[in-house]
Amino acid sequence: RKSYIEYAPKAKANLPKPKNPLEAFLPGHFIPEMSLAELNMSAAVKNNDMAIITIGKSSGEFLDRKISDSFNLTKEEKDMISGVCNAFHKAGKKVVVILNVCGVIETKSWIGGPDAVLLSWLPGQEGGNCVADILAGKENPSGRLPMTWPASYNDVTCGADFPNTETVKVGDVLGM
């Protein structure tokens, strides 16, 4: 935590500055993941009973998802999962990945690494307390997903139609 608190302001300062004042109303750039090289992994393993990795993804107006870094994990995220799993498993300690995501993501390529994956979706204000209760064993995270998670983007049924690059005029749609 301390390493990230020191990393985040420096990384944010390196983000590109808006060129247009209207960009202040649009979603900003996300800071890149901190590399594992910047962490003292041996101290992290020694000082913790387990590792918790949180992967967050979001989308919304002006922030459509991309296959490369929203549906698929980035190289940095995959490296983080692999590196943390290797270090903690070597010491006989567990690793949990928490997915704080707005939609399905590819999991097939990395799901074998962590000991558990918890899908929290977008849990809101009390999400941290809910996740803590699950990790502490106070609550059972049982449930069923109301959908199937695709193994690859090719399995997403609407994938062929997104992003839609065809221009449609409102008048044409309304018959005007």
Predicted segments — roles?
Residues 6-88, 99-112:
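Hydrophobic helix-and-loop "lid/oligomerization" segment in the mid-to-C-terminal part
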Residues 4-28, 91, 100-176:
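Secreted, periplasmic, or luminal enzymes acting at the cell surface/secretory milieu
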